[in-house]
Amino acid sequence: MHWSEIIADRIIKRNPNKEEYVCAAGISPSGSIHIGNFRDIATSYFVVRALIKKGKKAKLLFSWDEFDRMRKVPVNVAAIDSDMEKYIGCPYVDVKNPFDTEEKTYAEYFEHEFERSIVKFGINMDYRHQAEMYRSGKYTEHILHSLKKRGEIFDILASHRTQPVQEGEREAYYPVSIYCSECGKDTTKIVSLSDDCTQAEYTCACGHKGSFDFTKDFNCKLAWKIDWPMRWMYEGVDFEPGGKDHASPHGSYDTSKDIAKKIFGYEPPLFQGYEFIGIKGTTGKMSGSSGLNLTPETLLKIYEPEVILWLYSKTEPLKAFDFCFDDGILRQYFEFDKMYSAVKDGTANDAQKDIMYNTTVGDRELETVPMGLLVQLGSVVDFNVPMLETVFEKIGTPYKSEQFSARLDKAKYWLENCAPDQVNRLRAGRNWEVYETLNETQKAEIKSLFEYISAGGYDLDELNKKLYAIPKEINGEDLDEKALKTIQGAFFKNVYKLLIDKEKGPRLYLFLFAIDPQRYVGLLDFSYPKTEEEAKAEELAKVEDVVENEDKHVYGEADAFVPFKDEQVSIDAFEKLDLRVCEILKAQEIRKSHSCLKLTLDDGSGENRVIVSSIKSEYTCEQLVGKKIIVIANLEPARFAGVQSNGMLLAATNGACGCQVVFVPDCVPAGTQIK
């Protein structure tokens, strides 16, 4: 049974005769809504579908928490309008729209952006706009009730925290924030409340002092852990998921659950915590308010909506999975296609059927043209659709444009924006630099292939056999199997390098058969000398390589000089530090961290050392492996993102250069002490 059906059964068991079940989700429009938030929606959506599958009426209630205060300005928003910080403290619904669009407010802009992408998933939601709910007075009686119960609410909150209650803290607590009538911000403090809890006096950080009548003035909002259970009660919510941080002991759900029962007299909904989403192949903290985010719309440029839903459906909520911007996406498409086809042809098991049940988008029928094949062959024909149709016809898979055009767009976007190193393009001229490194036997292999291709008259199977036969024909028939495989592998690499400047590419026999031989056969012909044009092209390529390898980072101005510390350190104190040269053997991304890398080091002791460093935004793993660095080796171990770090590397951080690790010349042995 699918995990969503297990949850649905629990919901029905709690209240078997309810007319309509309510599954909830909600997001604050702090910026572009990132894909991590989408798990909130997907989890509730699948439970709604499971309830409907069981013959029940159910809806997905979605709250736009646009009445929340603006906490900070996302980086991408600040880049458009540097004056947005003045809105910090105002509700999102009152913040201006900094973009040149028709939406009236900041909240509306990001809400519409997200809603447009949700339509593409075929998900129907019943929207609640919390600013309208509060300001229309619909929550007034519950706000008054909360004010009357403020002492009890404080006691519940205090029971879920570790720090002791300070004297006078309970008396000064109010479960509601007032938005100032003068500046519009929530930087207010209630200084008095009438006995019937209807009238309040408040002061604001802006200097304004005012009166507030909770029966007539609605520009106020309950604190999060009171607002949440109040809305459960108001909407009759039966189920709501949340990030695993909310699910922790004494976290938001535990606290709100107690408030729902003891303050609002409502049995809290079933809650399902979920693991956060990982991102492979890109960096940057994934959050809406930081500006470094990956929205559903962004993912839809490389993923079909069904594949995104499939990833959520096949993964239990408390298990992590990754969206892949590297070639892991090709594996995901392959696995999706395999399961989709099994369901379609009737060979799927019950578990596969349950997973795929949640992935349908309206009446869409998918064509499972292999994404890997589109990636491999698409770039070779410059994503020309008629040419690709011809290629597919030649290799015995006669897909038509209407079958692959949608996926082809995603393959092209992925290659050009996420994996440009995997683009396969034929060279403009012969690769003399590679050819001149070959020995005579290898050159003879290339000549044999050139002659075979030039002669033509072969089919796909004959070409495949010939590619494996050429090394054997040139090197002799008496090679053992291991030696033959080594020579064949080297031959394939040489052909790839001569044709596309890479050591590997699409399956070679498909590649050579699919493309018009006249486009590439000349690249294998070294029977005449290097031309003047080829010599000039080589020189130009060397210059371009130098330019390409120059530092591409764009930094700002240097930080202001920080005065030296007054406190001096004695030689004895300095000698307590054990600074060692270490070689980086392995660098790995840490799934739970958006900024840290796990580095495995050779510290000269004979046993590897592991440290964690927040340099992910500055260096790729490939750039670090093999480098030598300086590490404080006797630093007290500490845990970061679930990994124990046994030391700290030395690096310089400045606005003019970012974070630059101090590297050591390769001639210095690992384990050398810095004295």
Where do the PLM segments sit?
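N-terminal catalytic cores of NTP/NDP-binding nucleotidyl/phosphoryl-transfer enzymes
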Residues: 1-78, 229-248, 603-607, 612-625, ...
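Conserved oxyanion/phosphate-binding beta-strand-loop segments in alpha/beta enzyme cores
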Residues: 1-19, 212-224, 581-589, 599
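A glycine-rich helix N-cap at a beta->alpha junction
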Residues: 81-103, 107, 114-117, 121
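Active-site cores that bind ATP or allylic diphosphates and position pyrophosphate for catalysis
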Residues: 123-296
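Catalytic adenosine-cofactor/nucleotide-binding cores of aminoacyl-tRNA synthetases and other
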Residues: 248, 253, 275-420, 500-540
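Helix-rich, typically C-terminal accessory recognition domains appended to large enzymatic cores
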Residues: 373-390, 439-521, 526-528, 632
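Small-residue-rich helix-loop
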Residues: 391-453, 460
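Phosphate-backbone binding interfaces of nucleic-acid-interacting proteins
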Residues: 536-675
